[in-house]
Each structure stands twice: as structure tokens, then as C-alpha cells.
Amino acid sequence: MTFKDLRDFIAQLEQRGALKRIQVPISPVLEMTEVCDRTLRAKGPALLFEKPTGFDMPVLGNLFGTPERVALGMGAEDVGALREIGTLLAQLKEPEPPKGFKDAWAKLPMYRKVLSMAPKVLKDAPCQEVVEEGDDVDLGRLPVQTCWPGDVGPLITWGLTVTRGPNKERQNLGIYRQQVIGRNKVIMRWLSHRGGALDYREWCQKHPGQPYPVAVALGADPATILGAVTPVPDTLSEYAFAGLLRGHRTELVKCRGSDLQVPASAEIVLEGVIHPGEMADEGPYGDHTGYYNEVDRFPVFTVERVTRRQKPIYHSTYTGRPPDEPAILGVALNEVFVPILQKQFPEIVDFYLPPEGCSYRMAVVTMKKQYPGHAKRVMLGVWSFLRQFMYTKFVIVTDDDIDARDWNDVIWAITTRMDPKRDTVMIDNTPIDYLDFASPVSGLGSKMGLDATHKWPGETSREWGRAIVKDEAVTRRIDELWSSLGID
């Protein structure tokens, strides 16, 4: 499935019966969350609210509410095909030297395709068909959702934030929630280790006191949005990766007020600056944990300019206790992670991030164990190899006879193959999600690894239990007789 922009994607989803237009007036304050939540839990379609109460701008919700739609957004026809994307990323992250001329020739098309996907910069773009500046800027015209009863106010959720560090050519794309606090001001809630926050910190060090340019694209095409949340190697820009997913180069346009480049087909772009030292209290908001987060201070983004398409579509979502849209994204992106991990750790058979664990706080790994202590090496590798797992609190490692995605199997392995003292690894003072109020200090907490593998000599002095296995001949005979027994 290929598409040129968000509108093309919407049209193709509608042709497939995977998008529903809602013509009944629905309020962005609480009501859209209720409708989207019920639809997502029923594995229903994407929703285009054509008459949001109090606004004349349609709202797109539940766009990535099923793993299948995430796959379509990444240019794949099914979720299983996402493993191929993971294999490509693994090759780009850790390229292997060719084994000979034939191997080099075979790999050449892949690298040539990557090199050919550099973004294309346009002079004119749909996202700049309408320009509002200065006193004409009014974020109150956007149908920004207020998702939960305890939320402090409207929250921009699907904004693609574009930044650049002072010493970098490559731009960073990140998705950070933004609390609307005024006609032209939002709070930029980026965590300290995220790309945008790092770029901003470097800017403040090199240009103290000077305003920092930022742009936020709303309603970019799905490949660009999903490229921003995928573990793209540092050698590959998110824009180039989006081109690979889409099958053609990402088209960009230079912002009107800075050198930042934004997706040319975006529905809405917010341009402006962060004034160093201007901070505000952010929150509380209901979040993907299922709780309201505590109030914390973050930089204020002053919007100097809004550019947009004619009759734009506002793309939004809500976050709450799983399942929610981020959890569904996690289920799909899980398939991308597997080949990347297997490239570094070939002994890994499967890797699973349960959506119930907020899609990143717990991981289950199955592996082909080869020596004593092997499980501990793998769990430490999971924590350190990809920054996406920096906040994973629990890593469960077990043997390849266990289905990582079946809790009955996993719990059986934990309760029969673990000694709590010997097989539990505790690591203190590690990075933890700021939203994790269970940690004793904001942003710093502990991690637990559970070794639920069979134990080898050296790990135990006892004879290890032998698993019960059925007699295959008896199983075949009963299979043949089963229908005659009248049991079901």
C-alpha cells in the first residue's frame, strides 16, 4: 500500500472499510475519547469526526487503532511483514562486510535504495497554503482534545516536533505531548534524554539566552509519523526512512521563519521558538499508565506562525490504561524490534512487549540457552542495546520451548524454573520514565531481571527436572479415535 499524504491514506482506508465518517456532532472535550476508546476496544475503524462540537475543522482519531492499520501505514500489507522492515533496520544498524563479490553485488540494491531516499525539498507546499502570523495566531481554533475528566486542559498529542542541534546537520523528529496554555503558547513536554530535549540543551550551551527554533507538524503522512517512533539507526534520518516505507522520497519544505524543514503535505504546522528560561507547570494529564501524572515543569513553546492546508484535518489521539492507541502501536512495532535484537543476539527466538505492561515496561524474551549465565547476558543486552528499552523495568528470559506471548506458558516457566533469590537480578539507580510514580525518585529507579530458563551445571547443584512429554504414538491413535468417543 502506497500513499502520498494523510488524505490519500484516509481515502484508501475508507475504500477498505477501515475508516468511518462520523457526522453526528461530538465534542473534543471527553466525548471523542469515549467514542475512540469503545471503537479501539472493539477493533473498529479509524474515525473522522466531521462535525466536532464548536469547530469547523474535522478531527481524525483512532488512526492506528489496530496493528493492521499500523502495518498499512508503514507500507506493509500485514503485521507479519513488519519483520522485514526490522531486518532492513538491523542491516543498516549493524552492516556486515560482504563475504565476497557475489554477496556485495546482492546487497548493492538495498544500499542504493537507501541512498536514493534523501528527502526532496520543495519551494511551495500544501502545508503553507494558508499562513497566520503574529496576532492572527490562535490555537483555540484547533479542535484539540481534552481527554479525561481530571485533565488540566486541551492536549496536542500527535504533533511531530522538528528540532536541530547547533552542531548537527540532521534534524530530529519526536512526538511529545503539548499542553495548550494560551492563544500562542504550549508546553513542550520532552523528557531529558529525548532527541528534542538534547538538541535544546546543546543550543542553550552554545547560544545562551537566544530563542530556539522549533516546528510542530500535525497531520503528516503515516510513514513520516511512524518513522519518528521506530528505532531508526543514527546513520539514517527519519525522513529518509519514511521514504523507504512509502516507496518514494519524503517531500519537505523550509519553514517560513526558520531553516527547519517540515513535511510538505502536513495538514497544519506550528512554527515558533522556545525562549530559554521560560518554563511552566505541565499537567496533570491521564496517561498511558492509566493514571494521572504529577505536575512538572517544562519549556514553553511560543507559536509565532501557523501554516496549514486549505480545510485542514486535525489528527488526534488519547492515552490511557491499555489498550489505547500507543499500546496498539507497541504491538505492531514489536515485530520490528525482533530482527534488530536477533541481529545482535542470534540466540533470541522471540521478544514480546506485553501491551498490558504499557508496551515498554516489561519484556519477555525466549532464547536458545547455550551456557550458564547466558540468560543474564541477554537481559542486560535488552536493557542496553536499544534506547527504546531504557525504561523497561522487568525483563523475563526463558527457554525456547515457552511461548513468549502466552502468559500461561510464561507463568509456568517462572514458577517452575526460578529460585527467587538466585534467579532475580536487581539493578538500582537506572533511568526510569518520569511518568513512573512508583519509582522513589523522579526519573531514577530500579530494574528487575527474571531468569526463568532451565538451569545448567554451575547454576544449580541439583538434578534438573525433566519435562513431561506425551507419547506420540498414543496421541496419534487417540486422534484417530476421537470423533467416535462422542466427547464433543
From Swiss-Prot:
Its EC number is 4.1.1.98. SUPFAM superfamilies: FMN-binding split barrel (SSF50475), UbiD C-terminal domain-like (SSF143968). Mn(2+) binds at N172, E238. Pfam families: UbiD, UbiD_C, UbiD_N. It is an enzyme of class 4 (lyase). It is found in: Cell membrane. Keywords: Cell membrane, Decarboxylase, Flavoprotein, FMN, Lyase, Manganese, Membrane, Metal-binding, Ubiquinone biosynthesis. The active site is at D287 (proton donor). One of its GO terms (biological process) is ubiquinone biosynthetic process. GO terms for cellular component: cytosol; plasma membrane. The keyword Manganese applies. Its cofactor is prenylated FMN; Mn(2+). It catalyses: a 4-hydroxy-3-(all-trans-polyprenyl)benzoate + H(+) = a 2-(all-trans-polyprenyl)phenol + CO2. Pathway: Cofactor biosynthesis; ubiquinone biosynthesis. GO terms for molecular function: 3-octaprenyl-4-hydroxybenzoate carboxy-lyase activity; metal ion binding. Prenylated FMN binds at I175, Y176, R177, R189, W190, L191, R194, G195. InterPro entries: UbiD (IPR002830), UbiD-like_C (IPR049381), UbiD-like_N (IPR049383), UbiD_bacteria (IPR023677), UbiD_Rift_dom (IPR048304). It is a peripheral membrane protein. Binds 1 prenylated FMN per subunit. Its main location: membrane. Belongs to the UbiD family. Homohexamer. Catalyzes the decarboxylation of 3-octaprenyl-4-hydroxy benzoate to 2-octaprenylphenol, an intermediate step in ubiquinone biosynthesis. This is 3-octaprenyl-4-hydroxybenzoate carboxy-lyase. It comes from Pseudomonas paraeruginosa (strain DSM 24068 / PA7).
